[in-house]
């Protein structure tokens, strides 16, 4: 979709003193007017993808994306999510220099299923410059309004499987894969433009107990007795994981229907997801519960922290980046949970403990000392209770913002 005109925002010299002072930011080109243009060619897409590296060049905890993945993500012929949505990529300019970016998304199927008229923004990046931020947000709001939307929320991309929300607590902690890393000023920029809380997501950090507490082992033993005929599959080879990829993600589709922002995987997206992550995951951190017919009833997937490896390679896999990333995952003392689900008919029967003990055993064997829960919805009290039983504490909080659109 196309923005019909390039928006131009006034020079600070045309503002009163208080307004001019409000747009003072950290970028040296403050004072120039802002123009907004749509990404239409490969050069502009390159600028869109690589702008965050300039903004975050002195940001110690920021982890670049894996650029090979990023190029495929923004390629409509490779990323099937584009087929279900209206999208737009915008760049902000001061003079000829790119100073900001944002993506707009309208997910028609999600809106229909949830009876909503909400547009989304994602991949919002600027220096600390309210003038640029307002120009980008205004452009997305106008675009969404033009498509009949009544509200804009974000950061939220195609689904909850993509990085979502802005960090509002835990700025001193390192970023993990598939999560956003932002400066505090980005939160201020949104709030000053009228955005407020839509939804919070929390992340727990758990100290991995060694040895595993006796009470947890007793619960595991009881669960095994009560679930005769079920077994926890463990893996040492990615090749042996592959036959379970589609069954695992089909289970996710069935169990995540009420999760905020979740969009079911299509068959093609299942393959894309596997290609994107499987080579990075130590198969020892994949646990799957099956019944006697080898049907998947539950699963959990973890990954060694790879942030330092990606930082070292600057987001490049080749020629040697992949080795640094895999070494980082092995050497890291932190295990990051990625996904997990239990068939609704088997909830409350101890399958979580059966998998959990096996995961803790693998984590201890691999030298892990802490566990990151990944993002959990603040109202998901059941999962949060389980994390807290293990001594977990919230150490990061992310917020998805929203704003009503006026006619």
Q: Language-model features: where?
A:
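Acyl-donor-binding surface of acyltransferase catalytic domains
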Residues: 2-27, 133-236, 399-405
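A generic N-terminal leader/anchor concept
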Residues: 2-10, 15-122
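A short beta-loop-alpha structural element at the N-terminal edge
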Residues: 35-47, 232-247
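A conserved beta-strand-loop-helix scaffold within acyl/acetyltransferase catalytic domains
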Residues: 52-94, 102-112, 235-340
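Acyl-donor binding region in acyl/amide transferases
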Residues: 111-194, 199, 313-390
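Active-site proximal loops enriched in glycine and acidic residues that flank catalytic Cys/His/Asp
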Residues: 290-291, 300-306, 338-344, 355, ...
